[in-house]
């Protein structure tokens, strides 16, 4: 299948972590690893400095691979002193450079009609694909983009950088505006690609990676395992973008590499993984629920829906806590939802219980410990930041002591007020028989470095990966900085779809033996060592 990335950026950028990939060479290496045929690319200097200067640099850079890299220019309002004064100048320069897409970078100017009306009208008349980041929208994304799209109904717009929590805005915009297209690099919504293709057709869905900062393998796996026809997947993977660019794009499918890598061989063909896969971080909604209040939609977010998606891609087992138990601090009822799922699906689901000292007294916690761990066989412990306590608070100590006595594990989402990573290190020393898993360790290089240092000092601490940024090459970094036995695959499903998180590991530049450990064997070892009370 021919993959053509609609959302990539190269070039020097401010405030970059030293490990973050940025160059044209990095992008081409990542494309080769993930078997992408082409990419629509902007230059970071056109984002942070002068658009014309940065666009000129872009043309030089894409000359390194003209059959694989295609330009998207950053623009300003026509008539700006530092930009083209008239539409024929801008469009003429674009035609000369064969530029068929533009991006409006958020900055100190407005997209109001009085500022951008002439520019949008010129782009609309010329049918230029226009990339707009969700960052423009402020607090009311629907109102902002609804007005803009309503004013220019024939302007082909590709929305980028929207996230799973903005579904209510994006979905309604898609319902109302046929000129709106979306990509899924950060919009990792559970069952989203199938749902949107069914409701809106696949023609407005586009493959984007967020490269060079996001993992391209994560993005493509959402399509590889999509429950859609081969023809539909081909349109989303690259055909739709080529159409929007009026035929511009790569002509040849990327060559297949990693012949000896079973994970990649199965993923590229949409075959469920035969490698053992164990999700170390997931939530669940009550039966039949599709969301979590005014903020979040989680399509098919109950246990039945989650298990079905897992089977599509080959996730064998899942460690599950409720959503409303930790996030809404409704611990006991949330634990009961998990228990019902455990009864229905047996060993496929490992129970993770929540205790909340802000709503439960010591006797409540002791009773809940006896019920969930002694009687029902839960293995995981999940405190949460919304309890507004340090994890070293005295209210947690009976729970930690029980976990230590029975070699259970805790999944720790840390924040400054919980004690941070250092606090987990102190708990790991105090309760050495427990396994302490730090959640979201792959969210950034800065956090990954902090977690890796803690693991080196405390061998009973582990790094669980999941987070929306799917930071490019951070899986490899964590394995290198620790070893391949302290890094764990997780998804945070159904808040996020599990497939991008799975692809982050499947397409990592790691030997097959290391992938097997990260995908499931490491977490299985943690669960298996627990002494069931």
What name fits each language-model region?
Residues 7, 31, 58, 94, ...:
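Conserved, mostly hydrophobic/aromatic
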Residues 23-30, 54-62, 86-93, 118-119, ...:
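A general structural detector for well-ordered alpha-helical segments in enzyme core domains, enriched
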Residues 100-101, 108-207, 376-380, 388-489:
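Catalytic pocket-lining loop regions of alpha/beta-barrel enzymes
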Residues 1-17, 55, 59-75, 264-296, ...:
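Mobile, glycine- and charge-enriched loop segments
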């Amino acid at each position: 299948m021919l993959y053509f990335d609609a959302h990539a950026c190269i070039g020097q950028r401010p405030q970059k972590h030293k490990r973050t990939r940025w160059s044209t060479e990095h992008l081409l290496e990542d494309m080769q690893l993930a078997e992408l045929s082409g990419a629509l690319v902007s230059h970071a200097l056109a984002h942070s400095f002068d658009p014309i200067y940065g666009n000129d640099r872009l043309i030089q850079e894409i000359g390194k691979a003209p059959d694989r890299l295609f330009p998207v220019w950053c623009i300003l309002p026509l008539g700006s002193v530092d930009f083209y004064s008239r539409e024929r100048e801008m469009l003429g320069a674009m035609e000369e450079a064969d530029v068929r897409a533009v991006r409006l970078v958020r900055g100190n100017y407005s997209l109001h009609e009085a500022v951008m009306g002439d520019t949008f009208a010129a782009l609309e008349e010329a049918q230029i694909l226009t990339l707009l980041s969700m960052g423009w929208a402020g607090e009311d994304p629907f109102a902002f983009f609804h007005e803009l799209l309503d004013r220019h109904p024939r302007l082909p717009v590709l929305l980028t950088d929207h996230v799973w929590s903005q579904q209510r805005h994006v979905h309604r915009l898609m319902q109302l505006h046929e000129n709106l297209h979306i990509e899924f690099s950060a919009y990792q919504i559970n069952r989203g690609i199938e749902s949107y293709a069914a409701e809106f057709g696949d023609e407005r869905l586009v493959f984007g990676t967020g490269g060079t900062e996001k993992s391209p393998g994560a993005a493509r796996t959402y399509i590889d395992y999509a429950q859609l026809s081969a023809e539909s997947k081909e349109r989303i993977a690259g055909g739709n973008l080529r159409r929007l660019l009026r035929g511009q794009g790569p002509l040849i499918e990327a060559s297949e590499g990693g012949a000896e890598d079973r994970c990649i061989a199965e993923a590229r063909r949409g075959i469920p993984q035969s490698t053992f896969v164990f999700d170390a971080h997931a939530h669940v909604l009550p039966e039949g629920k599709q969301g979590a209040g005014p903020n979040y939609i989680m399509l098919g977010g109950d246990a039945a829906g989650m298990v079905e998606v897992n089977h599509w891609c080959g996730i064998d087992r899942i460690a599950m806590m409720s959503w409303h138990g930790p996030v809404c601090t409704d611990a006991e009822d949330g634990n009961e939802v998990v228990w019902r799922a455990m009864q229905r699906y047996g060993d496929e689901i490992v129970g993770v219980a929540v205790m909340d000292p802000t709503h439960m007294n010591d006797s409540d916690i002791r009773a809940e410990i006896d019920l969930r761990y002694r009687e029902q066989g839960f293995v995981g412990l999940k405190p949460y930041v919304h309890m507004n306590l340090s994890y070293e608070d005295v209210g947690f100590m009976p729970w930690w002591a029980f976990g230590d006595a029975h070699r259970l594990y805790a999944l720790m989402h840390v924040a400054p007020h919980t004690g941070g990573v250092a606090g987990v290190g102190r708990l790991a020393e105090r309760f050495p028989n427990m396994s302490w898993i730090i959640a979201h360790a792959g969210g950034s290089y800065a956090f990954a470095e902090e977690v890796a240092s803690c693991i080196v000092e405390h061998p009973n601490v582990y790094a669980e990966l999941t987070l929306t940024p799917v930071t490019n090459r951070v899986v490899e970094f964590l394995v290198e900085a620790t070893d391949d036995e302290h890094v764990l695959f997780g998804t945070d499903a159904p808040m996020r779809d599990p497939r991008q998180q799975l692809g982050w590991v499947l397409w990592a530049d790691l030997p097959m033996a290391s992938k097997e450990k990260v995908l499931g064997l490491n977490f299985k070892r943690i669960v298996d060592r627990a002494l069931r009370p």
